[in-house]
Amino acid sequence: MRVSGASWISAFLVAATLGVAAWAWMTLPPGAGVPTHYLGLDGHRHAGVSREALWAIPFASAVVTLALTFGPRFTGRRVEAFAPELYGMILISVTGLLLVTEATLVARAFDAGFNVMRPVAMATGILLLAIGNYLGKARQNPVVGLKTPWTLADPRVWDKTHRFTGRAMVIGGLALIGLGLLLHDGTLLGLAIGLCTAAPMLAGALRSRTLAHQT
């Protein structure tokens, strides 16, 4: 079973994420850790720090890499003939984003005033740019892409929808990078990440419906 170059790059990014976590584990002073916020069984919100939470993102990154590398092979759904560049870019971009997220959380553990959302927003913008640049090259397939009833039914609708959505993702990525540079409020940046990520996909789904009805 041949492992792609994208999977090896992703594995390196996973190792780097694990290295950041290990370094923080050994370097952080006693009692320090990643800030945590959760809703308890008592119905109240709780806040604290957790040293063990340092390992959550490296674990998630490893799971993503293994799932995206071997999942399609075990299910018999190969992507090499349909969207090899897009699939590889998704793999690299997601693990890269998780590396940035881990690094920012570690920085926050050392400095309570560090703004986690700004670098995460800009990294998400880069992810949208990277994936959007390759989205239009994906051919119709059941594994990766914007799968709506209309794109799966008509290759022409698939191609036009993915070119449109790819351009929208590039615009969203550029906007998110700019907002990450300009804004400081974490709530606003969180909303911007959600909007810039979801809007291109929603616009693409609506576009596929319009294209299908034009045929």
Regions flagged by a language model, labelled:
Residues 24-30, 63-75, 130-146, 206-211:
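Membrane-water interface of transmembrane alpha-helices
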Residues 13-14, 47-63, 114-131:
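Alpha-helical transmembrane segments
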Residues 11-25, 58-70, 99-102, 127-129, ...:
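Hydrophobic core of alpha-helical transmembrane segments in multi-pass integral membrane proteins
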Residues 24-55, 144-153:
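Active-site and channel-lining beta-strand-loop segments
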Residues 141-213:
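Terminal transmembrane helical module of multi-pass membrane proteins
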Residues 6-12, 54-62, 68, 87-96, ...:
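Select subsegments of transmembrane alpha-helices in polytopic membrane proteins
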Residues 105-151, 155:
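Membrane-proximal helix-loop-helix units in multi-pass membrane proteins
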Residues 69-116:
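Ordered, amphipathic secondary-structure segments that act as subunit-interaction surfaces
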